[in-house]
């Protein structure tokens, strides 16, 4: 009985992990780059999407104004031409690199916060008070007791 339960639980966990992995992967990344952020993030709102396949038509899921939104991608014109060209992989945006194929907005937001933390305008760290040697709150030095 115990081995049956073990194998059943193992099989269930394997299938659940595979199913969740496919759901998180989502579809293909859509053509183009997310538009550049204009302004700073003041208050986050609800996200409209989690991946490009959540957005209708050719819109992309981009992190703008503190949340993910479905927006039309920036399209860069070929030099001397009239057609749009997908340059999202070949030429990075100023100050950053394009998102690699298959990456999700969640990894993009994590890298955004890792690079820009603390957010601009928050202020500086508080100075350490003079004479403060230790920040061990609630721990006072006590004499060593000898155990006999």
UniProtKB/Swiss-Prot annotation:
Disulfide bonds: 34-62, 41-66, 49-61, 55-70
Subcellular location: Secreted
GO molecular function, one term: serine-type endopeptidase inhibitor activity
Chief location: secreted
Alphabetized UniProt keyword annotations: Antibiotic, Antimicrobial, Disulfide bond, Protease inhibitor, Secreted, Serine protease inhibitor, Signal
Gene name of this polypeptide: WFDC12
Disulfide bond recorded as keyword: yes
GO biological process annotation, one example: defense response to bacterium
Region (Disordered): 74-148
Lineage of source species: Eukaryota, Metazoa, Chordata, Craniata, Vertebrata
Its job: Antibacterial protein. Putative acid-stable proteinase inhibitor.
Signal sequence range: 1-23
GO cellular component annotations of the record: extracellular region
Protein name: WAP four-disulfide core domain protein 12
All copies of domain WAP, residue ranges: 27-74
SMART domains: WAP
Alphabetized InterPro entries for the sequence: Elafin-like_sf, WAP_dom
């Amino acid at each position: 009985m115990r081995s049956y339960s073990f194998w059943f639980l193992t099989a269930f966990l394997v299938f659940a992990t595979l199913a969740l992995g496919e759901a998180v992967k989502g579809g293909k990344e859509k053509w183009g780059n997310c538009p550049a952020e204009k302004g700073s993030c003041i208050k986050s709102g609800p996200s409209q999407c989690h991946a490009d396949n959540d957005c209708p038509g050719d819109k992309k899921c981009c992190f703008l104004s503190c949340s993910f939104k479905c927006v039309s991608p920036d399209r860069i014109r070929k030099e001397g031409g009239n057609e749009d060209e997908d340059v999202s992989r070949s030429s990075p945006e100023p100050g950053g690199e394009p998102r690699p194929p298959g990456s999700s907005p969640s990894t993009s937001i994590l890298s955004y916060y890792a690079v820009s933390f603390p957010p601009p305008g928050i202020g500086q760290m508080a100075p350490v008070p003079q004479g403060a040697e230790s920040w061990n709150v609630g721990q006072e030095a006590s004499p060593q007791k000898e155990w006999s």
